[in-house]
């Protein structure tokens, strides 16, 4: 009996101290990376990079919109669920923080780590004020770390975009993304095992086991099993990234020009017999890789390693209970990040790419070969305006100088061949003789990108209409 009374018990303050140390280490590491990147830019590119986007009405509006949406989600849930959500947010503030972090990730990914810090702190303060929840400094620090991690992912993408070789840029971004996931796994393992071993020594247990004791669920794991689950999750994420990269390589090899970097789809048009190059913007590789990297990294470093420390302060449960609870709900949190963040980024991709292009191209030296995206924006209007003319070499050189990069003679010749191939597909269409062909009034749209705006006059029985067409002329159907 005396043994039980005198047995030392783990103190919550000791665990929270470890959390503050964890925050300080990760914060210093992220700031050190930003400092190293800035020095690298100064040494190689002779310029100081900006870690925040240009302040403007559009960016400020978007940041405010993201903050407002994050706060509104919490308030809407409280209104729909009545007192249940309010009681849940007050009894378990970690649930509220988990919802907040989704929008914090989007803000950091769009605008960088500095804006991510500001958005995270603002979102947490406002949700506590309007929802009447429990304020905990640990949750604020967790949101700040999430915004910084998302912002670092943006900085990595900007850094790899400076490489003039597209394949090298894609591979570098893949390697850095995998490195972030592996680093998050190692940090989580080291931190969780360190705290658990300390608690095991305090309790005097021979084996420290994680126990989840809910009214209808009794579940427990050893530390070894817990570590293996995190390891298998990390391996699965890395394999998914590699498969995504292989699919991207195979797809872009057939759907892009090497030098001009036009992405295209080649298909037989429904209204004529010629094949057209339809220029598209294929950004799905970076978008999906962004979401997977961000979701897995924040899940490991924040939801599993950091937040359970402060869950013990706001609830009556132990640290090992929240470790296991967060692990059990990890698949739901991961899928929720993917489902919510991906479509939002899909809508905001033009804004994100605009920020990337601005950060890459501003004050860039002419000797540095930047992405041909800027050249596309200048050349495409000329192609559309003068489809029947071939771009002259002197004109292309002038456009290249206007977009701040130099071309060798060999690159110039290859680039001209690519532009010629692109414009020839339009030239063939321009030469179609349609003087004796009346417009086709189709009952439905027969092409994803029609050349003409055909008028729909028949809504029923389109099969009979096409089967009984009067004549065919140069690929056109006359009805």
Swiss-Prot record:
Gene Ontology CC: plasma membrane
GO biological process: glutaminyl-tRNAGln biosynthesis via transamidation; regulation of translational fidelity
Subcellular locations according to the entry: Cell membrane
Chief place where the protein resides: membrane
Membrane topology category: Multi-pass membrane protein
UniProt KW keywords: Cell membrane, Membrane, Transmembrane, Transmembrane helix
InterPro entries from the UniProt entry: Asp/Glu-ADT_sf_sub_c, GatC
Family: In the C-terminal section; belongs to the GatC family.
PANTHER family given in the database record: GLUTAMYL-TRNA(GLN) AMIDOTRANSFERASE SUBUNIT C, MITOCHONDRIAL
NCBIfam families: gatC, PRK12821.1
Protein name as catalogued: Uncharacterized protein MG098 homolog
Lineage summary: Bacteria, Bacillati, Mycoplasmatota, Mycoplasmoidales, Mycoplasmoidaceae
